[in-house]
């Protein structure tokens, strides 16, 4: 892989800045049957909680214009099973793992972070304080700066690897949230998570999602995501992994231009399971067209 795409941020030596977003790539093993996942910059695996979660009732997914709504509810087999099974299977691949950590209270987050950060192939944690689809935990931690800072401090104290905090767009001031978790010791940020929305059944007029609301993702949210990255990148001194509606290499360049250091691809994996390697293969040609040598030469050019 060309050095033109290599990116180094806390805990992560990325051969390229492209990674699948948590919740859109399962645990990566499934995609390993389709292509060499070692080609990816990193893998953000599905959220881990202290105990197994069965998620929200169905229906949990609805298609929207230029996107989708989901309310999966952090379904996962629990941190112990993830460590002994899914993470174990990923050890043979040359790709750093970012483990997504979720919980119902601070004690849950601390428990999961302490355990999963000790796994040899986990190089960073993604602290999920912004999931809008669970009744307890998630978004309640992601909308109060003081609560978010406190949680970040507690997780940092027990984590063996750098901690990236996933920010919610469902706030009035995302810069305040970013500064709060930076003060709490966050090594980096991932942003943005989904926007809260509702899709109605045209015949009944009732919400399609059993949970009523869900998280909106896909190209529809990309301008919002880029705006928020643009704002936060100028306010903090820690790196950002940008995400929100990325479909191709030019979307990646937009996020880098807005101030991100790396980019995660989410919903696009459902429409094209090969989207990540396709983007990686196209990035250098895009750099050539722009007349730049390295991907990070574009970082923050929107406000420089």
Swiss-Prot record:
Its cofactor is FMN. Pathway: Pyrimidine metabolism; UMP biosynthesis via de novo pathway; orotate from (S)-dihydroorotate (NAD(+) route): step 1/1. It catalyses: (S)-dihydroorotate + NAD(+) = orotate + NADH + H(+). Binds 1 FMN per subunit. Disulfide bonds: none annotated. InterPro entries: Aldolase_TIM (IPR013785), DHO_dehydrogenase (IPR050074), DHOD_1B (IPR033888), Dihydroorotate_DH_1 (IPR024920), Dihydroorotate_DH_1_2 (IPR012135), Dihydroorotate_DH_cat (IPR005720), Dihydroorotate_DH_CS (IPR001295), Dihydroorotate_DH_I (IPR049622). It is an enzyme of class 1 (oxidoreductase). GO terms for cellular component: cytoplasm. Substrate binds at residues 46, 70-74, 128, 193-194. GO terms for biological process: 'de novo' pyrimidine nucleobase biosynthetic process; 'de novo' UMP biosynthetic process. One of its GO terms (molecular function) is dihydroorotate dehydrogenase (NAD+) activity. Heterotetramer of 2 PyrK and 2 PyrD type B subunits. Belongs to the dihydroorotate dehydrogenase family. Type 1 subfamily. This is Dihydroorotate dehydrogenase B (NAD(+)), catalytic subunit. It comes from Fusobacterium nucleatum subsp. nucleatum (strain ATCC 25586 / DSM 15643 / BCRC 10681 / CIP 101130 / JCM 8532 / KCTC 2640 / LMG 13131 / VPI 4355).
């Amino acid at each position: 892989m060309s050095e033109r795409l290599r990116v180094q941020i806390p805990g992560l030596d990325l051969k390229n800045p492209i990674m699948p977003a948590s919740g859109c790539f399962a645990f990566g093993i499934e995609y390993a049957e389709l292509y060499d996942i070692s080609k990816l910059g990193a893998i953000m695996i599905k959220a881990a909680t202290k105990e197994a979660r069965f998620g929200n009732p169905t229906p949990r997914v609805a298609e929207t214009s230029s996107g989708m709504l989901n309310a999966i509810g952090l379904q996962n087999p629990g941190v112990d099973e993830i460590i002994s099974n899914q993470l174990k299977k990923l050890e043979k691949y040359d790709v750093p793992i970012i483990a997504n950590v979720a919980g119902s209270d601070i004690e849950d987050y601390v428990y999961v972070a302490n355990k999963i950060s000790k796994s040899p192939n986990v190089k960073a944690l993604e602290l999920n304080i912004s999931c809008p689809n669970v009744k307890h935990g998630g978004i309640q931690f992601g909308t109060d700066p003081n609560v978010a800072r406190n949680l970040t401090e507690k997780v940092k104290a027990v984590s063996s690897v750098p901690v990236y905090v996933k920010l919610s767009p469902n706030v009035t001031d995302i810069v305040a949230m970013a500064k709060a978790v930076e003060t709490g010791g966050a090594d980096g940020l991932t942003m943005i998570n989904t926007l809260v929305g509702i899709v109605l059944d045209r015949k009944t007029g009732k919400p399609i999602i059993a949970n009523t609301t869900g998280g909106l993702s896909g190209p529809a949210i990309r301008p919002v995501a880029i705006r928020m990255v643009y704002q936060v990148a100028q306010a903090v001194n820690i790196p950002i992994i940008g995400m929100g509606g990325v479909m191709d290499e030019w979307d990646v360049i937009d996020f880098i231009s807005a101030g991100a250091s790396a980019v995660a691809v989410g919903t696009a994996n459902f429409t094209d399971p090969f989207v990540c390697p396709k983007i990686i293969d196209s990035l250098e040609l895009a750099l050539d067209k722009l007349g730049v040598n390295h991907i990070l030469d574009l970082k923050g050019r929107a406000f420089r």
